[in-house]
Curated annotation (Swiss-Prot):
This is Glycerol kinase. HAMAP family: Glycerol_kin (MF_00186). Its EC number is 2.7.1.30. One of its GO terms (biological process) is glycerol metabolic process. It catalyses: glycerol + ATP = sn-glycerol 3-phosphate + ADP + H(+). It holds the Pfam family FGGY_N. Belongs to the FGGY kinase family. It comes from Acaryochloris marina (strain MBIC 11017). PROSITE patterns: FGGY_KINASES_1 (PS00933), FGGY_KINASES_2 (PS00445). Glycerol binds at residues 84-85, 136, 245-246. ADP binds at residues 14, 18, 267, 314, 415, 419. ATP binds at residues 14-15, 267, 314, 318, 415. Pathway: Polyol metabolism; glycerol degradation via glycerol kinase pathway; sn-glycerol 3-phosphate from glycerol: step 1/1. Keywords: ATP-binding, Glycerol metabolism, Kinase, Nucleotide-binding, Transferase.
Amino acid sequence: MTSATYIMALDLGTTGNRAILFDQDGQIVDQAYKELPQYYPQPGWVEHDALEIWRDTRWAMETVVTQAHIDPAQIAAIGLTVQRETCLLWDKTTGQPLHKAIVWQDRRTAAYCNQLAEQGHTQDIYDRTGLVLDAYFSGSKLAWLLTEVKRQNPNLNLDNVIAGTIDTWALWNLTGGKVHATDHSNASRTLLLNLSQGTWDDHLLDLFGIPKSFMPAIQPSLGIFGKTDTKFLGQEIPIAAIFGDQQAALFAHGCDRPGALKCTYGTGSFLVAHTGSNIARSKNRLLSTVAWTQTDKGQTQTGYAIEGSMFTSGACIQWLRDGLKLIANAAETEGLAQAVEDNGGVYFVPALSGLGAPHWDMSARGAFLGITRGAQREHMVRAVLEAIAFQTKEVVDAVNQDCGSPIQQLKVDGGACQNNFLMQYQADVLGIPVERPAVLDATAQGAAFGAGLAIGVWKDYAGLVAARKIDQVFKPGANAQTAQANFKTWQKAVERAKNWAD
């Protein structure tokens, strides 16, 4: 490695923003994190303040450098990974957002999406984008934002308006407003990217009423996007990789060939399988998406993936803490779940933001079923953890059907993986081993690996991946049969929770 001995990863997630420093061996040196406030202006609506995201990003960058006692000149590159689909509009002359960012979990555009479906657009949108027509993705959110900001400010000069997902917003700010760009992995989550061409789709921009001038330039995921303005850290540091968070985790796990897959347990759970250089079309309502892109001899090389997106997993645990006040912190859920022999007949449907794959039911809502006078707090907590494992099984079953050859092992990452009860239950219900790495921040690790490889700090991707340490492999145990029987009961509960909201 050169005299610059660190790579910084910026991991801008749904619940918080983090800066992590990695050394030349790909190991974490230090990190700084700040939880991000969530705004719920109406039921089913979720917003973030983009200025808070940027302020916390700056704070995390400066704090991690101070904590690690390093000179910013030693940072060779920055890799950026973000929550996907969350988007905003801002004024490029003032740098001010025109509205709070609409978060991926937000359902305010469900009726608008249903309208488009009734007009017969569903199949065409899937054919062009690989995505289902759902309020989850950015297209309908940007359409809503544009209508709303024009309503609030009829004299708005649209020539000054630009749009982006969180990577684009962060990049624009990091470069002092010089670069308005995104990468293919984030662009593929907007409902506006033509998946086979890798460019913005004019027909879909027209359909959603979004001017092309709003949209960022699309660049390969690995490569120099720009340099940080010297007013941050006093250095021009290349921003050398951008990934959506799930694609970054896929990259960290070394899933770069057909059939290699991982599951990340964050705010939601996301199971992603690489499909090589071909777009795989699911028969089970999984998404086709870009894994990542890179340039080889001047040509853009695209890797694709299929994905099962489950909207609510870690968010359920957060809700137990903040909404129901059943727990003081996430860590205690493990002990509570283990304190009872079973779930006491209680089942939870984690449809707090509707249901994602494989149901795609925007009207589903969360539910506890099977409650009797004997149900205790421990049973409720256990039911929530079991539900996280059950929904992953649904998606693994769908991937198995699509791929034709059953998955032999599940690689996992994300904060909820710290929960040993959840990981063991996941192995039991799947009937296959679950491999947990020592570094659970695979999203940040993937962004760091990508940036370091892009600027030549590292040359050997396979070697980097091979050096990752495994913490534990959970194997199916004595409770596997019971867990699999409970899964069938849980599927009945899911049917009861579907088609609930208008």
